[in-house]
From Swiss-Prot:
It is found in: Nucleus; Cytoplasm; Cytoplasm, Cytoskeleton; Cytoplasm, Cytoskeleton, Spindle. It comes from Drosophila virilis (Fruit fly). This is Microtubule-associated protein Jupiter. Residues 124-135, 181-191 have a biased composition (Polar residues). It comes from the Eukaryota. GO terms for cellular component: cytosol; microtubule; microtubule associated complex; nucleus; spindle. Transmembrane segments: none annotated. The keyword Iron does not apply. GO terms for biological process: positive regulation of microtubule polymerization. The gene is Jupiter. Keywords: Cytoplasm, Cytoskeleton, Microtubule, Nucleus, Phosphoprotein.
Length: 205
């Protein structure tokens, strides 16, 4: 085992003589953080939390548009950069395409028809043939029979008149799916003796 005298020179002679030199500290000129003078010009630190929405821009070169995904957001007072040269090859080869002027849509305007204000809408609503609710004189026979049969159903007080409202044909005399009027004034009874599309269940499963 080595004696104490062999390693005495390592620590005893260097106490209080440690190296304290740092050439240039990262934050300033001096490495002595307690006794050094403050620098004359403070560092220009950008305050990211400060709002400049209602104030004039301090730095013209500083752009405050934020790029997120495919959208670009602009703050008040900032203009979109339309003067930039296009980057795509089509615009470089053929030039900028001419875009027609399209006025902005007024989203606050009502789209409900005002008959008194517009003569065209008044003419569309009341045509000369006396038709109403979008029905015109040039409809197919199938659709006209459907509309006439449903109107007959409304006129007759809910009692179905003879005829199929879909095809316009009359009912067969042996059909069992029909409405029987109630004798005592209660609700009508609908007889439905139909076979389901897959047939009746056998009850085995």
């Amino acid at each position: 085992m080595a004696t104490y005298a062999a390693f005495k020179h390592v620590e005893l002679y260097n106490v209080g003589k440690a190296k304290k030199r740092v050439l240039r500290a990262p934050g300033g000129v001096s490495s002595d953080i307690f006794g050094a003078d403050m620098p004359q010009t403070p560092r220009n630190v950008k305050n990211l939390m400060a709002s400049n929405i209602f104030s004039a821009e301090k730095d013209v070169a500083q752009k405050n548009n934020v790029r997120q995904g495919a959208h670009r957001f602009y703050f008040m007072g900032d203009v979109p950069r339309r003067g930039q040269k296009p980057v795509d090859s089509y615009s470089r080869l053929f030039g900028e395409p001419t875009r027609p002027f399209t006025p902005g849509k007024n989203h606050m305007k009502s789209n409900i028809l005002n008959v008194g204000q517009n003569s065209n809408t008044a003419q569309l609503i009341s045509n000369s043939k006396g038709n109403y609710n979008g029905k015109s004189g040039s409809v197919s026979s199938a659709s006209s029979s459907v509309s006439s049969s449903t109107e007959n159903l409304k006129i007759n007080g809910g009692i179905r008149s003879e005829g199929n409202p879909v095809t316009g044909e009359g009912y067969k005399p042996g059909a069992t799916d029909y409405i029987q009027p109630a004798n005592n004034g209660s609700s009508q009874v609908i007889n439905k003796n139909r076979v389901p599309p897959g047939g009746y269940s056998s009850g085995l499963w």
